[in-house]
From Swiss-Prot:
Residues 424-575 form the Helicase C-terminal domain. The lineage of its organism: Eukaryota, Fungi, Dikarya, Ascomycota, Saccharomycotina. The gene is PRP28. PANTHER family: ATP-DEPENDENT RNA HELICASE DBP3. A motif (Q motif) lies at residues 168-196. This is Pre-mRNA-splicing ATP-dependent RNA helicase PRP28. Gene3D superfamilies: P-loop containing nucleotide triphosphate hydrolases. The Q motif is unique to and characteristic of the DEAD box family of RNA helicases and controls ATP binding and hydrolysis. ATP binds at A212, E213, T214, G215, S216, G217, K218, T219.
Length: 581
């Protein structure tokens, strides 16, 4: 009730009561009772305030009675005398006159709350607003709000029914203890975002569609569920069938390089578990594959689609017991023309009917085939593949897949029609040497669109004392593998490559990507610069571009604007011209 008194506008009576310097005003008898009641309420409020203070009553309380007395006197004088006395203040020479020093006096220190409480108020408006962060809670203490914050922290978005909560720590999920131990031995401290999201869903034997960029930790995101599945298979079956040519798990990749990288990662686990992993890729003799299977058998195959189809047709491998499938970079497999081969492979896999009508259901502890698909984008073809071969999948979107890469600085050099090839190459030399001066342990990838351009660049760089290696489609598999090994080990600090050869290469410490020739499809630009700035590191890209690349300008403009990047002048001018047209 007291708050209403102080919030309303002051009447003439109140103004008179508070300021002795104003001219007394006659107060009708009918209003005097109301004024006295108002004074009484003020006195009560002042009394309440004083009980909560440890010091003497404030001056304003004393002034109330003084003011009241003055007001009464002034009123009496106004009644008895025809000319009321007017109180005036001595002029100070200031434009504005106050009863206090504006610069020195501060009333904030005199604030005393009406009620002081040490205990928290049980207010329903604040219920559920917990102050404890999820990192300080046990798993069973996590609330829905905690999980929402968790997903925001790790840029995880999900779509689908009954998606389980992400994985916080390796030892909190339903991962086999043997795998948890190996993960610790190999030095994987915490899961990445894609691993946190996909592993719990896959361990529920749900189909998974993961939308994430290369370099986000996808390999371990599908290896852990695959190996966890193999560990759940009947031990007697694995013991007696391990020397057969019937793998129980299959991982498909678009390129030989990516398949070899996945194989290398899988071998770290399989050697400790006693499992056999085998790559089936082009460039290797069929007889070598046959000999390997005859000697050790195979549990897990990592393959490219085309080579695997040939191996199936030659009866080298049999997929009739393969109930666990992974498709890595599915969008790239389709873009590279493997859709037909991919469908052939998937049609060779066992069905749910085989699980329910044979002993396989008890051996493999499954009711349906388990499929995981990872892709950078969901194209119509990928969506069609998903609907045909996956059952009720959960969709996982990790980070900014398909969006601008915030941790990569993107620079451009616009070349006029008068720019010679020699001028362009000299600029390339300056960029490389400048990067070397300011970067510790630099690794540079140079992309070109044609094999002969790669070879020419290699020769010119070598003549300028820049050690480099080259990979493209005309290089043998052994030469490509050796080139990547030399680059990875810093024996050569520059790798020159075409898009197809470099697709899927995962070298974590690439510091600079140079597009010597701009791509014809914009998606390839994203894949190229995505070779740097991996695993949270910062990266740089430099692109030579000219009027011959105008078909890329519009998607490039949208890409840069979406990521909050500054548009180069030449691209901004192109935008203006487009709008005017």
């Amino acid at each position: 009730m007291s708050s209403n008194i102080f919030k309303r506008f002051k009447s003439a009576e109140e103004s008179l009561d508070e300021d002795e310097s104003v001219t007394p005003v006659y107060i009708p008898k009918a209003k005097r009772a109301k004024l006295e009641a108002l004074k009484a309420k003020k006195s009560q409020i002042a009394s309440r305030l004083s009980t909560h203070k440890q010091q003497s009553a404030p001056t304003t309380t004393t002034n109330t009675s003084t003011t009241a007395s003055t007001t009464t006197t002034a009123t009496t004088n106004n009644t008895n005398n025809s000319k009321p006395s007017i109180q005036t203040k001595k002029p100070t020479g200031k434009k504005f006159q106050f009863d206090w020093d504006v610069e020195e006096e501060d009333t904030a220190s005199g604030f005393v709350p009406l009620i002081e409480m040490d205990e928290e108020i049980d207010d329903p408006l604040f219920s559920g607003q917990e102050s404890t962060h999820w990192t300080n809670k046990n798993l069973e203490e996590m609330t829905d709000r905690d999980w929402r914050i968790f997903k925001e922290d790790y840029n995880i978005t999900t779509k689908g029914k009954n998606i389980p909560n992400p994985l916080r720590y390796w030892n909190e999920g339903s991962i086999n203890d043997k795998l948890v131990s190996i993960i610790s031995q190999l030095g994987y401290e915490e899961p990445t975002s894609v691993q946190r999201a996909s592993i719990p869903l896959a361990l529920k034997k749900r189909d998974v569609v993961g939308v994430a960029e290369t370099g986000s930790g996808k390999t371990l995101a599908f290896l852990i569920p695959v190996l966890n599945y193999i560990l759940s298979i009947d031990e007697n079956y694995l013991k007696y069938e391990k020397i057969s040519n019937e793998p129980v798990g299959l991982i498909l990749a678009p390129t030989r390089e990516l398949a070899l990288q996945i194989t290398k990662e899988a071998e770290k686990f399989c050697k400790k578990l006693g499992y056999q992993v085998l790559p089936i890729i082009g460039g290797h003799h069929y007889q070598d594959t046959i000999n390997k299977i005859d000697q050790t058998g195979v549990h897990l195959i990592v393959a490219t689609p085309g080579r695997l189809v040939d191996s199936i047709e030659r009866k080298i491998v049999d997929l009739s017991k393969c109930y666990c499938l992974v498709m890595d970079e599915a969008d790239r497999m389709i873009d590279m023309g493997f859709e037909k081969d991919l469908n052939k492979v998937l049609d060779k896999l066992p069905t749910e009917k085989q699980l329910s009508s044979t002993i396989d259901g008890r051996i493999f502890h499954l009711e349906k085939r388990s499929t995981m698909m990872f892709t950078a984008t969901i194209s119509p073809t990928v969506e069609k593949l998903t609907k045909k071969y996956l059952i009720d999948p959960g969709y996982l979107y990790i980070g900014g897949a398909g969006e601008a890469l915030d941790n990569i600085s993107q620079s451009f050099e616009f070349l006029s029609s008068a720019t010679t090839e020699a001028t362009k190459f000299n600029k390339l030399i300056k960029i490389i040497r400048s990067h070397w001066r300011v970067t510790e342990n630099p690794l540079i990838i140079i992309f070109a669109n044609f094999k002969h351009v790669c070879d020419s660049l290699s020769q010119e760089l070598s003549s300028n004392d820049i050690n480099n290696v080259v990979i493209h489609g005309s290089k043998s598999q052994d030469m490509r593998e050796q080139a990547i090994t030399n680059f990875r080990n810093h024996e050569s600090e520059v790798l020159i490559a075409t898009d197809v050869a470099a697709r899927g290469i995962d070298i974590p410490n690439v510091t600079l990507v140079i597009n010597y020739q701009m791509v014809k499809k914009f998606d390839e630009y994203i894949h190229r610069i995505g070779r740097t700035g991996r695993a949270g590191n910062l990266g740089e890209s430099f692109t030579f571009i000219s009027d011959q690349d105008t078909e890329i300008f519009t998607p490039l403009k949208k890409f840069l604007k979406k990521g909050g990047k500054r548009l180069p002048d030449w691209l901004y001018k192109h935008q203006s011209q487009t709008v005017q047209e």
